[in-house]
């Protein structure tokens, strides 16, 4: 079985070799852990963001930069293709580990989750568990982790602190924007799972999403980065569905972000109206705007949802001069 942490370790080695070109900074903590700053104090950029996305996906996807037509604007976007969608997206990429140690907080994603089984129910559902001597984690945070944070991660992953490797970028950074847009395929799979679909029948995934500019601090950027997927993210999935075609059609109808009661305005506005309480925001919003599913059993193809570039332009706050 594929070891997502072994795959991630190889990407980390590349990042260490190319840190100057990536405009990242490498820190060695007192307990031997490795921290790669991709945008907290370091400048980072598109290439650092690409490496972050590769790390999140355990290098189990083909990633490329492309352009997206945003009502006539040629906008930077990222394209994701994977033939290991469940392991790449759910066993690794999904941001399923909220890490809070003292005054430090970050959202953890990437391979290390498969060692700590974060969350355990998901790994039981997909039948995956990793076993590797090193833990590779991507942290979305505006602070760099210290030794206490590393010790917390090491304990949960059953590895030595010196074998913990963390790449960090805040939401309000180009690298952070890139790795969030690269979640376009994952958000669709997660939404499928949340509506009761057997995600293990998903055999491949493809998606494209625009990359948000830095529009403010982390909380504002959390809005614009999510909007890239919610309003202009487009995905394609290949599945082997054992049920009736009508049943598959019902599942596909439920997945796009358009089904959410909060759909229709920039996410930051929705979040602000909810007093910045995630639990008051409809979780169904976190999904691609449009998806297409090709079922290999019925050889039928189904599509649902639509793209809404005008809302994304509003979210970005672009001014023509």
From Swiss-Prot:
<comment type="pathway">
    <text>One-carbon metabolism; methanogenesis from CO(2); 5,10-methenyl-5,6,7,8-tetrahydromethanopterin from CO(2): step 3/3.</text>
</comment>
<dbReference type="GO" id="GO:0006730">
    <property type="term" value="P:one-carbon metabolic process"/>
</dbReference>
<keyword id="KW-0484">Methanogenesis</keyword>
<dbReference type="GO" id="GO:0018759">
    <property type="term" value="F:methenyltetrahydromethanopterin cyclohydrolase activity"/>
</dbReference>
<dbReference type="Pfam" id="PF02289">
    <property type="entry name" value="MCH"/>
</dbReference>
<keyword id="KW-0378">Hydrolase</keyword>
<protein>
    <recommendedName>
        <fullName>Methenyltetrahydromethanopterin cyclohydrolase</fullName>
        <ecNumber>3.5.4.27</ecNumber>
    </recommendedName>
</protein>
<dbReference type="GO" id="GO:0019386">
    <property type="term" value="P:methanogenesis, from carbon dioxide"/>
</dbReference>
<dbReference type="GO" id="GO:0005737">
    <property type="term" value="C:cytoplasm"/>
</dbReference>
<dbReference type="InterPro" id="IPR003209">
    <property type="entry name" value="METHMP_CycHdrlase"/>
</dbReference>
<keyword id="KW-0963">Cytoplasm</keyword>
<comment type="function">
    <text>Catalyzes the reversible interconversion of 5-formyl-H(4)MPT to methenyl-H(4)MPT(+).</text>
</comment>
<comment type="similarity">
    <text>Belongs to the MCH family.</text>
</comment>
<keyword id="KW-0554">One-carbon metabolism</keyword>
């Amino acid at each position: 079985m594929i070891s997502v942490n072994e795959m991630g370790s190889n990407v980390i080695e590349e990042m260490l070799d190319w840190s100057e070109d990536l405009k990242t900074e490498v820190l060695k903590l007192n307990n031997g852990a490795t921290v790669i700053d991709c945008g907290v104090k370091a400048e980072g950029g598109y290439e650092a963001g690409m490496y972050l996305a590769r790390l999140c996906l355990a290098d189990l996807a083909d990633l490329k930069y492309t352009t997206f037509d945003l009502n006539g604007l040629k906008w930077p976007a990222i394209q994701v293709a994977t033939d290991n969608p469940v392991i790449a997206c759910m066993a690794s990429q999904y941001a399923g580990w909220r890490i809070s140690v003292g005054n430090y907080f970050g959202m953890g994603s990437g391979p290390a989750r498969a060692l700590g089984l974060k969350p355990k129910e998901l790994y039981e559902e997909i039948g995956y568990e990793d076993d590797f001597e090193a833990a590779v984690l991507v942290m979305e945070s505006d602070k760099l982790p210290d030794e206490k944070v590393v010790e917390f991660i090491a304990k949960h992953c059953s590895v030595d602190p010196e074998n913990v490797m963390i790449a960090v970028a805040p939401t309000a950074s180009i690298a952070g924007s890139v790795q969030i847009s690269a979640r376009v395929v994952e958000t669709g799979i997660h939404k499928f799972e949340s509506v009761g679909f057997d995600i293990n029948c998903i055999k491949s995934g493809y998606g494209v999403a625009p990359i948000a500019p830095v529009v403010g601090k982390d909380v504002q950027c959390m809005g614009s980065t999510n909007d890239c997927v919610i309003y202009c993210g487009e995905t394609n999935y290949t599945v082997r569905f054992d049920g009736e075609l009508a049943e598959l059609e019902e599942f596909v109808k439920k997945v796009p972000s358009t089904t959410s009661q909060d759909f229709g305005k920039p996410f930051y506005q929705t979040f602000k109206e909810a007093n910045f309480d995630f639990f008051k925001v409809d979780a169904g919003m976190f999904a691609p705007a449009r998806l297409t599913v090709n079922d290999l059993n019925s050889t039928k193809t189904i599509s649902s949802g639509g793209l809404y570039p005008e809302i994304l332009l509003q979210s970005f706050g672009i001014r023509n001069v």
